[in-house]
Amino acid sequence: LYWDDGTFNVYAIYPRMDKVLSLDSQPFSVALDQNTPKTATSLGGYEASDLLFASQKSVTASDSPVSLLFHHIMSKLRIRLIKGEDFEGELPTKAKVYIHSTFTSATVDLRQGIVTYNPNVARQSIIAHQDDETSYSAIVVPQNITTRMPFLEVEVNGVSYFYESRFNYKPGVENLVNLI
């Protein structure tokens, strides 16, 4: 990288974006199926949905590297299935977990590292990534769901169990929901 005289602002985002259309409102969407595994040539649905941002302002030319501290700008939801007192049998090790009623499209301000959901696109459902036998995670666009509506669905052997709630997905925050 050639440095000219003067000061510069350095911005970095992960994962890499192939086409940057706007620094102020770059379109971005989380994967609807975040349980899709990564391959030799592409990220899995979960990893491709997470955005990390770093910036360093007023950098001048030098031989030293520019230090960048990355932070998450999306929200993370973790769901744990816990065996309750009245549950008979064993917890399923292969369930399908859906996060419903979320905006999955957003714009990103690549100068500020701020994600804003796109209210002009219909709410959708996300298939969560299975972390282990009873834990699931999904990356969600920051948003506040103020109306009580279907929130989580756990599908086991063709039977669905629903949980309704309001929810506030904050940027850079991991939320944990225990389903008993």
Residues covered by each model-derived region:
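Extended, solvent-exposed segments with strong compositional bias
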Residues: 117-133
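Short, ordered, surface-exposed loop/turn motifs in non-cytosolic proteins
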Residues: 86-122
